[in-house]
């Protein structure tokens, strides 16, 4: 199973937070993904890049906050995250990188 270069465009970065760490105990991993990435694309990218079996993918979009910058109102970018549930016995060590 070789990774297609497009898979690297789908997965942006792992999310390392307290909540994401707690989810890892439930066999789930959280990634920041491209805003236009679909669930099947995310599933395929994770399976090819990390060589694991994915059970399901849940996505969420965090809307960017409005902030003041030099007296002007600005908008931060929206962030899309994917919570990937792995099959039993499968693990991903997100600290090692790709």
Swiss-Prot record:
Keyword DNA damage recorded: no
**What's a GO biological-process term for it?**
translation
- State the PROSITE patterns in the record: RIBOSOMAL_L23
Question: Pfam families from the xrefs?
Answer: Ribosomal_L23
The record's section on SUPFAM superfamilies has:
Ribosomal proteins S24e, L23 and L15e (SSF54189)
- A Gene Ontology term for the protein's cellular component: ribonucleoprotein complex
The record, for InterPro entries, names: Nucleotide-bd_a/b_plait_sf, Ribosomal_uL23-like, Ribosomal_uL23/eL15/eS24_sf, Ribosomal_uL23_CS
Return the Gene3D superfamilies for the record. 3.30.70.330
Role according to the record: One of the early assembly proteins it binds 23S rRNA. One of the proteins that surrounds the polypeptide exit tunnel on the outside of the ribosome. Forms the main docking site for trigger factor binding to the ribosome.
Record's protein name: Large ribosomal subunit protein uL23
Output the lineage of the source organism: Bacteria, Pseudomonadati, Pseudomonadota, Alphaproteobacteria, Hyphomicrobiales
């Amino acid at each position: 199973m070789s990774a297609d270069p497009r898979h690297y465009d789908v997965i942006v970065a792992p999310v390392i937070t307290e909540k994401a760490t707690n989810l890892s105990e439930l066999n789930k991993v959280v990634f920041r993904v491209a805003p236009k990435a679909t669930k099947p694309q995310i599933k395929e990218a994770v399976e090819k890049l990390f060589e694991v079996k994915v059970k399901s993918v849940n996505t969420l979009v965090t809307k960017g906050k409005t902030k003041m910058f030099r007296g002007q109102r600005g908008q931060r970018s929206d962030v899309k995250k994917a919570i990937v549930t792995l099959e039993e016995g499968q693990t991903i060590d997100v600290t090692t990188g790709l």
